[in-house]
């Protein structure tokens, strides 16, 4: 069975790559991973035993859908794990905790459109017009959810099975995160996981989304977070460094949270690899 890992940015799977003793600038590395050709705006890797493929899509719907189309056509995985960072929408989650998505919600539009009343289409017979704002949802693959849940329980990894939400823009402030959690009954919010699951569902490929919490429900991300490029890699070091010089404490807390979330994802992958849950490491 072949497994595909999908994330939006290199930071989310950097530890997974580095634990394989592989670097993209080492042309003839004998490590676990090798780089593949990928669609413009994405980065793709593959384990040398061909058991696991990985694609970094970039953030947002358009990039995710384009990269997923390539992945499903080129790699044809048997199962997909959507991995990455997320903001908490409930006080029951701490930085570094994992959220196993039981149901994936998506809301179109901007934060001004997210009130549930605005998501109900106007009655066309009464002369109104259909609203563009929609609320959609996808159920997680039950078998994959059970497999991963069992693995994290046995290994003592902090996690929560819960619905998650995908929106079009970064949710940066604590007040909005808390409101989304209370309004829609979700525990985490991101920008990509719904689109990964939707593409996998159309192709008939089992998919599970696992998100690592990078900031709590009572925390507000630094303003710089909303100005970083959506590319899978590159273009973020300079702005982050400049912001860190001006606001060292805020940036130190943010980078520490990113490191905790990144390590949580890597720990999950180590557990899944060592337990051979998805036959990772075996030749097809």
Spans of model-derived segments:
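Active-site phosphate/oxyanion-binding loops
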Residues: 98, 105, 163-179, 207-253
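Active-site rim beta-loop-alpha module in soluble metabolic enzymes
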Residues: 120-124, 128-188, 193-207, 213-218
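Active-site oxyanion-binding pockets that recognize sulfate/phosphate
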Residues: 134, 251-258
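Divalent-metal-activated hydrolytic enzyme cores
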Residues: 256-284
């Amino acid at each position: 069975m072949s497994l595909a890992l999908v994330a939006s940015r290199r930071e989310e799977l950097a530890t997974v790559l580095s634990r394989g003793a592989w670097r993209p600038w080492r042309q003839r590395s004998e490590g676990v991973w090798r780089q593949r050709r990928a669609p413009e705006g994405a980065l793709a890797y593959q384990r040398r035993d061909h058991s696991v493929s990985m694609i970094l899509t970039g953030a947002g719907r358009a990039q995710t859908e384009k990269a997923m189309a390539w992945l499903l056509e080129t790699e044809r995985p048997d199962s997909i794990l959507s991995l990455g960072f997320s903001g908490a929408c409930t006080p029951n989650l701490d930085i570094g905790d994992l959220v196993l998505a039981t149901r994936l919600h998506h809301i179109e539009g901007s934060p001004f459109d997210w009130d549930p009343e605005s998501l109900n289409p106007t009655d066309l017979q009464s002369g109104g017009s259909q609203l563009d704002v929609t609320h959609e949802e996808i159920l997680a693959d039950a078998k994959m959810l059970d497999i991963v849940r069992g693995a994290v329980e046995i290994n003592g990894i902090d996690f929560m099975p819960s619905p998650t939400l995908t929106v079009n823009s970064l949710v940066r402030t604590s007040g909005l995160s808390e409101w989304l959690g209370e309004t829609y009954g979700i525990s985490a919010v991101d920008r990509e996981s719904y689109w990964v699951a939707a593409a996998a569902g159309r192709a008939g490929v089992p998919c599970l989304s696992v998100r690592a919490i990078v900031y709590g429900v009572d925390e507000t991300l630094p303003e710089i977070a909303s100005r970083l490029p959506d590319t899978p890699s590159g273009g973020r070091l300079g702005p982050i460094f400049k912001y860190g010089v001006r606001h060292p404490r805020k940036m130190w807390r943010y980078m520490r949270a990113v490191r905790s979330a990144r390590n949580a994802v890597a720990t999950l992958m180590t557990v899944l690899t060592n337990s051979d849950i998805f036959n990772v490491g075996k030749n097809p």
